[in-house]
Protein backbone atom coordinates (compact mmCIF):
# COMPACT_ATOMS: atom_id res chain seq x y z
CA UNK A 1 0.00 0.00 0.00
CA UNK A 2 1.30 3.45 -0.93
CA UNK A 3 2.29 5.80 1.88
CA UNK A 4 0.70 9.27 1.89
CA UNK A 5 1.29 12.25 4.13
CA UNK A 6 -1.65 13.22 6.38
CA UNK A 7 -3.98 16.11 5.59
CA UNK A 8 -5.67 16.31 9.01
CA UNK A 9 -4.55 15.99 12.61
CA UNK A 10 -5.47 12.98 14.71
CA UNK A 11 -8.07 13.36 17.46
CA UNK A 12 -7.10 12.18 20.96
CA UNK A 13 -9.40 9.46 22.26
CA UNK A 14 -10.45 8.80 25.85
CA UNK A 15 -11.29 5.14 25.23
CA UNK A 16 -9.44 2.67 27.44
CA UNK A 17 -9.64 0.25 24.52
CA UNK A 18 -6.95 2.30 22.78
CA UNK A 19 -4.52 2.64 25.70
CA UNK A 20 -1.46 0.66 26.71
CA UNK A 21 -1.24 0.47 30.50
CA UNK A 22 1.40 -0.92 32.85
CA UNK A 23 0.11 -1.96 36.28
CA UNK A 24 2.59 -3.03 38.91
CA UNK A 25 2.75 -3.43 42.67
CA UNK A 26 3.22 -5.87 45.55
CA UNK A 27 1.67 -9.36 45.55
CA UNK A 28 -2.04 -9.80 46.32
CA UNK A 29 -2.86 -6.09 46.19
CA UNK A 30 -5.44 -6.60 43.43
CA UNK A 31 -3.60 -5.98 40.16
CA UNK A 32 -5.26 -8.83 38.24
CA UNK A 33 -8.69 -8.02 39.68
CA UNK A 34 -8.30 -4.41 38.56
CA UNK A 35 -7.13 -5.46 35.09
CA UNK A 36 -10.04 -7.89 34.71
CA UNK A 37 -12.44 -4.93 34.69
CA UNK A 38 -10.99 -3.34 31.56
CA UNK A 39 -13.40 -3.52 28.59
CA UNK A 40 -13.92 -7.07 27.27
CA UNK A 41 -10.59 -8.32 28.61
CA UNK A 42 -8.82 -11.56 27.68
CA UNK A 43 -5.86 -12.70 29.78
CA UNK A 44 -2.65 -14.21 28.46
CA UNK A 45 -2.01 -16.32 31.57
CA UNK A 46 1.77 -16.48 31.89
CA UNK A 47 1.74 -17.66 35.52
CA UNK A 48 -0.81 -19.15 37.95
CA UNK A 49 -2.97 -16.79 39.97
CA UNK A 50 -6.27 -16.31 38.15
CA UNK A 51 -8.21 -19.18 39.71
CA UNK A 52 -10.14 -16.87 42.04
CA UNK A 53 -11.31 -14.66 39.17
CA UNK A 54 -13.99 -15.26 36.57
CA UNK A 55 -12.17 -14.17 33.42
CA UNK A 56 -11.49 -15.17 29.84
CA UNK A 57 -7.97 -16.56 29.76
CA UNK A 58 -5.69 -18.50 27.46
CA UNK A 59 -2.74 -20.37 29.03
CA UNK A 60 0.54 -19.06 27.62
CA UNK A 61 3.24 -21.00 29.43
CA UNK A 62 5.82 -20.94 26.63
CA UNK A 63 6.89 -18.25 24.18
CA UNK A 64 5.44 -20.32 21.35
CA UNK A 65 2.08 -20.30 23.17
CA UNK A 66 2.38 -16.56 23.66
CA UNK A 67 3.08 -15.91 19.97
CA UNK A 68 0.18 -18.18 18.98
CA UNK A 69 -2.16 -16.21 21.26
CA UNK A 70 -0.90 -12.95 19.76
CA UNK A 71 -1.64 -14.27 16.28
CA UNK A 72 -5.20 -15.24 17.25
CA UNK A 73 -5.88 -11.82 18.74
CA UNK A 74 -4.38 -10.02 15.73
CA UNK A 75 -6.67 -11.98 13.38
CA UNK A 76 -9.60 -10.09 14.91
CA UNK A 77 -12.18 -12.89 14.89
CA UNK A 78 -13.17 -12.43 18.55
CA UNK A 79 -15.19 -10.12 20.84
CA UNK A 80 -12.27 -8.92 22.99
CA UNK A 81 -11.22 -5.29 23.30
CA UNK A 82 -8.40 -5.54 25.86
CA UNK A 83 -5.40 -7.89 26.05
CA UNK A 84 -4.01 -8.47 29.55
CA UNK A 85 -0.54 -9.99 29.97
CA UNK A 86 -0.29 -11.51 33.45
CA UNK A 87 2.53 -11.30 34.24
CA UNK A 88 4.98 -9.43 32.08
CA UNK A 89 7.81 -10.78 34.22
CA UNK A 90 7.08 -14.37 33.21
CA UNK A 91 6.47 -13.38 29.60
CA UNK A 92 9.97 -11.92 29.42
CA UNK A 93 11.49 -15.05 30.98
CA UNK A 94 9.75 -17.14 28.30
CA UNK A 95 11.04 -14.81 25.59
CA UNK A 96 14.59 -15.09 26.89
CA UNK A 97 14.39 -18.89 27.20
CA UNK A 98 13.08 -19.19 23.64
CA UNK A 99 15.85 -17.06 22.15
CA UNK A 100 18.51 -18.92 24.13
CA UNK A 101 17.15 -22.27 22.93
CA UNK A 102 17.23 -21.09 19.31
CA UNK A 103 20.89 -20.16 19.62
CA UNK A 104 21.73 -23.25 21.69
CA UNK A 105 22.98 -21.29 24.68
CA UNK A 106 22.05 -21.47 28.36
CA UNK A 107 22.21 -17.77 29.20
CA UNK A 108 21.89 -14.58 27.18
CA UNK A 109 25.44 -13.65 28.14
CA UNK A 110 26.88 -16.81 26.59
CA UNK A 111 27.11 -15.19 23.14
CA UNK A 112 30.07 -12.84 22.61
CA UNK A 113 29.88 -9.06 22.22
CA UNK A 114 26.46 -8.82 23.91
CA UNK A 115 24.72 -10.54 21.01
CA UNK A 116 22.56 -12.68 23.30
CA UNK A 117 21.20 -9.64 25.12
CA UNK A 118 20.53 -7.92 21.79
CA UNK A 119 18.68 -10.92 20.33
CA UNK A 120 16.38 -11.14 23.36
CA UNK A 121 15.73 -7.40 23.49
CA UNK A 122 14.94 -7.29 19.77
CA UNK A 123 12.44 -10.16 20.05
CA UNK A 124 10.84 -8.59 23.13
CA UNK A 125 10.57 -5.22 21.40
CA UNK A 126 9.21 -6.74 18.19
CA UNK A 127 6.38 -8.63 19.87
CA UNK A 128 5.33 -5.95 22.37
CA UNK A 129 5.38 -3.23 19.72
CA UNK A 130 3.18 -5.37 17.50
CA UNK A 131 0.71 -5.96 20.35
CA UNK A 132 0.61 -2.27 21.24
CA UNK A 133 -0.12 -1.37 17.61
CA UNK A 134 -3.23 -3.57 17.45
CA UNK A 135 -6.63 -1.83 17.72
CA UNK A 136 -7.16 -3.07 21.28
CA UNK A 137 -6.29 -1.96 24.77
CA UNK A 138 -3.17 -3.57 26.19
CA UNK A 139 -2.68 -4.06 29.94
CA UNK A 140 0.70 -5.25 31.21
CA UNK A 141 0.96 -6.56 34.79
CA UNK A 142 4.24 -6.73 36.67
CA UNK A 143 5.48 -7.26 40.20
CA UNK A 144 7.32 -4.53 42.11
CA UNK A 145 10.90 -4.40 43.36
CA UNK A 146 12.82 -1.85 45.41
CA UNK A 147 16.09 -0.78 43.79
CA UNK A 148 18.90 1.24 45.32
CA UNK A 149 19.74 4.26 43.17
CA UNK A 150 23.14 5.88 43.63
CA UNK A 151 23.80 9.49 42.64
CA UNK A 152 26.69 11.89 43.13
CA UNK A 153 24.96 13.33 46.19
CA UNK A 154 23.84 10.09 47.82
CA UNK A 155 21.55 7.14 47.33
CA UNK A 156 17.86 6.35 47.67
CA UNK A 157 15.39 3.52 47.12
CA UNK A 158 13.05 3.50 44.13
CA UNK A 159 10.14 1.11 43.61
CA UNK A 160 9.82 -0.04 40.01
CA UNK A 161 8.51 -2.95 37.91
CA UNK A 162 10.55 -6.08 38.60
CA UNK A 163 11.67 -6.58 35.00
CA UNK A 164 15.34 -6.57 34.01
CA UNK A 165 16.39 -3.10 32.87
CA UNK A 166 16.65 -4.09 29.20
CA UNK A 167 13.04 -5.36 29.23
CA UNK A 168 11.69 -2.57 31.42
CA UNK A 169 13.04 0.20 29.20
CA UNK A 170 11.21 -1.26 26.19
CA UNK A 171 7.95 -1.38 28.16
CA UNK A 172 8.23 2.13 29.60
CA UNK A 173 8.66 3.53 26.11
CA UNK A 174 5.46 1.87 24.88
CA UNK A 175 2.90 2.56 27.57
CA UNK A 176 0.45 5.45 27.97
CA UNK A 177 0.09 4.93 31.73
CA UNK A 178 2.34 3.51 34.45
CA UNK A 179 0.15 2.75 37.47
CA UNK A 180 1.87 1.91 40.74
CA UNK A 181 -0.45 0.05 43.13
CA UNK A 182 0.39 0.96 46.71
CA UNK A 183 -1.14 1.24 50.20
CA UNK A 184 -1.53 4.15 52.60
CA UNK A 185 -2.42 4.02 56.29
CA UNK A 186 -4.93 6.29 58.01
CA UNK A 187 -5.50 6.74 61.73
CA UNK A 188 -8.92 7.95 62.90
CA UNK A 189 -9.76 10.03 65.95
CA UNK A 190 -10.01 6.86 68.04
CA UNK A 191 -6.51 5.81 67.09
CA UNK A 192 -7.69 2.98 64.85
CA UNK A 193 -5.53 2.41 61.78
CA UNK A 194 -6.98 1.46 58.40
CA UNK A 195 -5.15 0.65 55.20
CA UNK A 196 -6.33 1.84 51.79
CA UNK A 197 -5.16 0.51 48.45
CA UNK A 198 -4.36 3.27 45.98
CA UNK A 199 -2.94 3.96 42.52
CA UNK A 200 -0.07 6.39 42.06
CA UNK A 201 0.04 7.79 38.53
CA UNK A 202 2.55 10.65 38.44
CA UNK A 203 6.36 10.50 38.28
CA UNK A 204 8.19 10.55 41.60
CA UNK A 205 11.82 9.99 42.63
CA UNK A 206 10.90 7.04 44.87
CA UNK A 207 8.64 5.11 42.47
CA UNK A 208 7.98 4.63 38.75
CA UNK A 209 4.70 6.13 37.52
CA UNK A 210 3.36 8.22 34.67
CA UNK A 211 0.25 9.29 32.76
CA UNK A 212 0.54 10.77 29.30
CA UNK A 213 -3.27 11.00 29.00
CA UNK A 214 -3.43 13.84 31.53
CA UNK A 215 -6.65 12.41 32.95
CA UNK A 216 -5.50 11.00 36.27
CA UNK A 217 -4.75 12.75 39.57
CA UNK A 218 -1.56 12.01 41.49
CA UNK A 219 -3.36 9.34 43.51
CA UNK A 220 -6.75 7.67 43.36
CA UNK A 221 -8.32 4.59 44.95
CA UNK A 222 -7.44 1.19 43.52
CA UNK A 223 -11.00 0.98 42.29
CA UNK A 224 -11.81 0.49 38.62
CA UNK A 225 -14.98 2.60 38.72
CA UNK A 226 -13.04 5.59 40.07
CA UNK A 227 -10.33 5.02 37.47
CA UNK A 228 -12.67 4.55 34.49
CA UNK A 229 -14.66 7.65 35.45
CA UNK A 230 -11.62 9.73 34.60
CA UNK A 231 -11.95 8.67 30.98
CA UNK A 232 -15.53 9.90 30.80
CA UNK A 233 -14.43 13.40 31.85
CA UNK A 234 -12.14 16.11 30.42
CA UNK A 235 -8.42 15.72 31.01
CA UNK A 236 -7.24 16.56 34.51
CA UNK A 237 -5.57 19.90 35.21
CA UNK A 238 -2.56 18.55 37.07
CA UNK A 239 -1.77 22.01 38.45
CA UNK A 240 -4.99 22.10 40.46
CA UNK A 241 -5.67 18.41 41.10
CA UNK A 242 -4.33 17.17 44.42
CA UNK A 243 -4.74 14.07 46.51
CA UNK A 244 -8.35 14.86 47.41
CA UNK A 245 -9.58 11.62 45.88
CA UNK A 246 -7.77 9.62 48.55
CA UNK A 247 -9.35 10.28 51.90
Residue spans of the language-model regions?
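Conserved, well-folded catalytic cores of nucleic-acid-processing
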Residues: 72-76, 94, 130, 170, ...
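Long, low-complexity, intrinsically disordered polar/charged segments
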Residues: 74-112, 175, 227-228, 232
